Amino acid sequence: MIVIPAIDLKDGACVRLRQGLMEDSTVFSDDPAAMARKWVEQGAKRLHLVDLNGAFAGEPVNGEVVKAIAKAYPNLPIQIGGGIRSLETIKHYLDAGVTYVIIGTKAVKEPEFVKQACDAFPGHIIVGLDAKDGYVATDGWAEVSTVKATDLAKQFAADGVSEIVYTDIARDGMMQGVNIEATVEMARAGNIPIIASGGITNMDDIKGLMAVAHEGITGAITGRAIYEGSLDLAEAQAYCDAQ
């Protein structure tokens, strides 16, 4: 299992939101590329970038920053999410050196788009499923649907998605601990690798996820915890490597 630092981009800066609210953001750095360097130096094996403006605009807004980070680390897998709603955007990011593109809202609203993307760019597509009480949320978490996250996971696994980033939005940015039960349920439902996200606060969460990693949990995304110091990235990754 790899521990993946999140770099959330808003207006060209690296920020962190609480429960996905744009107005409730904390700026951690106005130099996202320097932030990326910091995490790489601490042993990051992949970076998770989110274009927050893009998620709300429905198209890339912080693309230049993403391109700069990808260029600086050509051998480091980078995944990007936020505002990815067309094959053109996916191609744009892959051409810029990004490894994986995360489809979020569009995957839920137009599931057939996921199949098209997987056919066009095999091995590069991740779906981001954000759920609250087991039901999928969309549009920067503004809307909660009547669709069960586990049902979609099965469908996307069949479409050829590489991994699913599963976020429990009730816990994201709240430092309450990760929802291990829901994450395992997702991995079992789709029989597809799951990257856990939302609520990862300290080493207890990393240990808890590692204990069930054999269920198909391949990664853990962490944001606020590593920025505020309740989790040490290097220590967390070293623990996972040693298991």
Swiss-Prot record:
Which example biological process does GO assign this protein? Answer: L-tryptophan biosynthetic process
> Out of the domains of life, which is the source?
Bacteria
What is its pathway? Answer: Amino-acid biosynthesis; L-histidine biosynthesis; L-histidine from 5-phospho-alpha-D-ribose 1-diphosphate: step 4/9
Q: Which residues form the active site?
A: D8, D130
Q: Which residues, if any, are the signal sequence?
A: none
| Catalyzed reaction equations | 1-(5-phospho-beta-D-ribosyl)-5-[(5-phospho-beta-D-ribosylamino)methylideneamino]imidazole-4-carboxamide = 5-[(5-phospho-1-deoxy-D-ribulos-1-ylimino)methylamino]-1-(5-phospho-beta-D-ribosyl)imidazole-4-carboxamide
A cellular component term, taken from the record's GO annotations: cytoplasm
Q: What is this protein called?
A: 1-(5-phosphoribosyl)-5-[(5-phosphoribosylamino)methylideneamino] imidazole-4-carboxamide isomerase
User: Which species is the source of this protein?
Assistant: Saccharophagus degradans (strain 2-40 / ATCC 43961 / DSM 17024)
